[in-house]
Regions:
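A conserved cytosolic signaling coiled-coil/coupling helix that links sensory/transmembrane modules
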Residues: 96, 100, 155-159, 163
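Generic hydrophobic alpha-helical scaffold/packing signal
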Residues: 134, 155-158, 167-170
């Protein structure tokens, strides 16, 4: 599940507005405790949170790839029943929704990092980190695009198999009548 988070950077402090605790915040706290000077100021905290979020997005995309591989084997394997096709279509819809939310999250993160860099709020080291985050996002954009294409292919193939199954049933009834 996804959750919207708003950040306010004011007077050297970072405020986050969110409904619940997120794993990204826990991971940042853990890293900060284990590595002295991991974050030195509020802008470091914000950049690290954005970077961790991009890492999480990459992990989720990897999970989508794994599930799509399973769907591909079901769709392109042996004959598929209408019930199996329905389950596959439902799974594809879930993955499409998740991929869309990841894509939107990456877009929001890109806008936030670009804004911080454009208004010159970051020092040179932070700008370097911002550029790396943007490169990571660019890389993930290609993956989310591929996932959308793969989802569309699997959906079309599944619907095609449903049509073939329905045509067989119609032929049986035509011959019987």
């Amino acid at each position: 599940d996804t959750m919207r988070v708003a950040f306010i950077l004011k007077s050297g402090m970072l405020f986050s507005i969110r409904r619940d605790e997120l794993a990204q915040f826990r991971l940042l706290r853990l890293r900060a405790r284990r590595q002295p000077y991991y974050v030195r100021d509020a802008k470091d905290v914000l950049l690290q949170l954005l970077d961790i979020d991009v890492e999480y997005s990459a992990d989720i995309i990897e999970g989508i790839y794994d599930r799509l591989d399973t769907f591909s084997k079901q769709v392109l394997g042996s004959e598929m029943s209408d019930d199996t096709a329905g389950i596959v279509l439902s799974g594809i819809a879930v993955e499409e929704d998740l991929n869309g939310r990841i894509r939107r999250n990456l877009m929001d993160t890109r806008r936030a990092v670009s804004f911080l860099m454009r208004v010159k709020l970051l020092n040179e080291q932070q700008n370097d980190e911002g550029r790396q985050i943007l490169r990571d996002i660019d890389s993930l954009d290609g993956h989310t695009g591929f996932v959308f294409d793969k989802l569309n292919f699997l959906m079309d193939a599944t619907v095609g198999f449903i049509n073939i199954n329905q045509n067989r049933i119609i032929k049986i009834f035509s011959v019987a009548s």
